[in-house]
Amino acid sequence: MKQVITAKLKLHLSKEQKELLREVSLVYRNALNYASKVAFEKGKVSSANKLQKLIYQDIRSKFDLPSQMSCNVPRQVAATYKGLWTKLKQNAEHLQLGQTKKRYKGLDKPPKYLSRTCNLNYKRDYSFVKQEVSLITLQGRIKVPYSGYNKHIKLIKSGKNTVKFGGAKIYYARSTRTYYLLVSLELEIPNIEPDAINRVVSVDVGQRYHAVTTDTRNQTHFYSGKQCNRKATCYEKARKSLQQKGTRSAKRRLVSLSGRERRFVADQNHCLSKQIATPNTLIGLENLTNIRERTKPRKTGKKASIKQRKANHKQAKWSFAKLHSFIDYKAVLNNSLAIKVDADYTSQACPHCGYTSRGNRPNKGLVFHCESCGFKLHADLVAARNIAMRTLLTRQDWESTGSLSATPDGSSVEAKAARLSRFAELRWTAE
């Protein structure tokens, strides 16, 4: 099994070296904008090979970039256009289904690159030499000392024996005026066998409680999102005030505020995922694909009440996918595994008698009260228990069939119906 992580290395540059990196990053950015303009004029090209044939010689002559960086420019621009075309197609589908009235405008003009970054290839553009990293510039190579997270430094020093080096990116942090090197590291990790798993944990994510976890031994943890939500409200008020002012200094402040809020949310998710992804654990997550479309509010914008607008904003800021991705990669590094199970009816099904109804959770509140057997419990914990039972069933299938994704033959709809039918027979007895 392979797992890719990113090592963030702080570059300790002299004044001359800093100027050389500034020069190459600005020239690279200008080359990206030139390539973006050409791609737009030639029919919004999203093929890297086609774009490279159109602009490679121009980039070499006009911007004096090294050959490998001149190849990276059309690849990066083509990838951007490919993403924009995907969004345009999705928007067309949503317009046809009546899910939105807004036309996607991402391809109305060529995308502009503002960040001072450079994409580098291992050995051709950068390499590690003893305690330094060798970086390419327009004036030749420079050797720069670096620092970073101790685990990442150890992996880099161990060399090709334990890690495979991938692409890297030079990144400039304007707030601290510091250059960083973001290096992709591919780790070879032994395949996880069912016998190595000694614990099953389920995770129910939400907005009031960012995560509620439980296992088959009834060890339960509630991770409140109160502090994070309060902080998000403060950021929202500050952002609203600055947007109303509209001055140049207010816009600069908005940029820094956006970065700070993003880093705060990422830090919260990192800390939470670290506590959840314990060693030798099978972690069950809800499959929340297209959850925003399925839970789309009835009223948005000016038609919605103030209360509804606040709820809509809170839902839009909900970063459950990021939390899932953090749990996923941290689990692999800890000899654990995160899998996704169907999220259908996890908050409506009684784990004791199996009765499923919306009435079991009155007004979608915090209390689950079964209309059939009278079982009463915290609604998020009920959801976590249902996820745990589904995860345990998946593990049993894994042990018996040797396949982690054992599904009955038939269409995806039939397969899902069969899975939900099996889930309805599960009962929670670990009291």
Language model features with spans:
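Short aromatic-glycine motifs in intrinsically disordered, low-complexity regions
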Residues: 1, 152-153, 193
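Long, compositionally biased intrinsically disordered regions
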Residues: 1-73, 81, 89
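Generic structural motif
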Residues: 12-18, 138-140, 147-149, 158, ...
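Acidic carboxylate diad motif detector
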Residues: 51-175, 225, 313, 317
